[in-house]
Amino acid sequence: SSKDSKQLDAEVHRKYIYGGHVAAYMNILMEDEPEKYQSHFSSYIKADLAPDNIEEMYKKVHAAIRPDPSPKKSQKQPPKTHKRYNLKKLTYEERKAKLIERLNALNAAGGNDDDDEEDDE
């Protein structure tokens, strides 16, 4: 087994670098499960990538990386601000002000008969 000998097989390595394993898998899926191939490799199909031109694509990509290895900035959409379902906690002062506001509203609505609880006896 090659694991023990720690020897790097150049041909195998080359195959992986150029996506040979992907191309092989694409061929297997094409023959055995065409619908799975369609869904699994939909972006490849859109990009017009077939198993036989994957190696070409990788060679082009590698050739393009060599002159300028710095990653290209892609145009990303700015993240959307998410709606907060849990409201921010109010400070003690804000809670106190709200309570006073509620009490005032209750008193105004109740016509200021604060002592009606004692009259029920």
Swiss-Prot record:
Localization in the cell: Cytoplasm; Nucleus
InterPro entries: Rbsml_uL18_euk (IPR005485), Ribosomal_uL18_C_euk (IPR025607)
Predominant place of localization: cytoplasm
Signal peptide feature range: none
UniProt keywords, alphabetically: Cytoplasm, Nucleus, Ribonucleoprotein, Ribosomal protein
GO biological process, one term: translation
Residue ranges, compositional bias (Basic residues): 73-87
GO molecular function ontology, one term from the record: 5S rRNA binding
Region of interest (Disordered), ranges: 63-88
Gene Ontology CC annotations of this record: cytosolic large ribosomal subunit; nucleus
Subunit structure: Component of the large ribosomal subunit (LSU).
Its biological purpose: Component of the ribosome, a large ribonucleoprotein complex responsible for the synthesis of proteins in the cell. The small ribosomal subunit (SSU) binds messenger RNAs (mRNAs) and translates the encoded message by selecting cognate aminoacyl-transfer RNA (tRNA) molecules. The large subunit (LSU) contains the ribosomal catalytic site termed the peptidyl transferase center (PTC), which catalyzes the formation of peptide bonds, thereby polymerizing the amino acids delivered by tRNAs into a polypeptide chain.
Protein family per UniProt: Belongs to the universal ribosomal protein uL18 family.
Protein name: Large ribosomal subunit protein uL18
Species of provenance: Solanum melongena
